[in-house]
Amino acid sequence: ERHITVIPEIEFPAHSDAVFIGYPELCCTGKPYTTGEFCVGNEQVYTFMEDVLTEVMELFPSKYIHIGGDEARKVAWATCPKCQALIERERLDGIQGLQPYMIARIQDFLASKGRVMVGWDEILHNELHSETLVMSYRGQKGAIEAANRGNYAVMTPGEVLYFDWYQADPSTQPRAMYGYSPIKKMYAFEPVPADPESAARNESIIRAEFVDPAAVEPIRADRADRIVGVQGCTWAEYIEDEEQQEYMIFPRLLAVAELAWTPQEKREWCDFKVRMNSHIPLLQQRGLN
């Protein structure tokens, strides 16, 4: 009816602190509040995740299931007997090989159920199925690498497309995560950098410094269709209520929408700004802050 697909995300193997309050045996220490990562060497973890994902798939018809895969600190794995035993048994590349092992198992499980795995760009350490979708939040490189490898990718670089970053002088704004992403910066980003100049401009926006086109690898022209979209993210650590959330998202969402739908050669900032200003009263009429 609304042409929206809700994609659930179940974070794995990190950002899982809440799980260990009820299931402390699933982390390496056996105690809550001590680590945010599942124990890779504990077979119960995979039973738990398969049970959770099975229920999620019953609730959500989405073809895509997001498993996270980001920001695993790996500290507890280094001293965990079960993790070390798994490294030896499977001849993994130390603790760095543990996350790819976990992700591969979950990827295969989802595929066996006819679903497609989505993950943040750390999953590029894996051999990925051809349909697996990579969300590139640490700059644009993850999406470029994924596309050039033949995988699908979504551009969502935190330095540009995070709505929880400041959109103006921080001294004039409600408290935000950090950074600086005004609407003009968002609008200047090119989601499909299929030539050195576009890739270098993006990198200059991300780094806030000049970048030589010769120093940046673009997406191969025959892989440009592997970038399937852009995503603006709103993390809520510093967002206190719905009004503040709307303030952080709008009108920047208008710029992100145009990035998603309009080719680079048809985008022009001054023209967009005129059209954006005409939309602001419409947003206000709908009660948006």
What are these regions (language model features)?
Residues 117-122, 127-132, 136-289:
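Flexible, acidic glycine-rich loops studded with aromatic residues
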Residues 1-117:
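Substrate-binding cleft of carbohydrate-active enzyme catalytic domains
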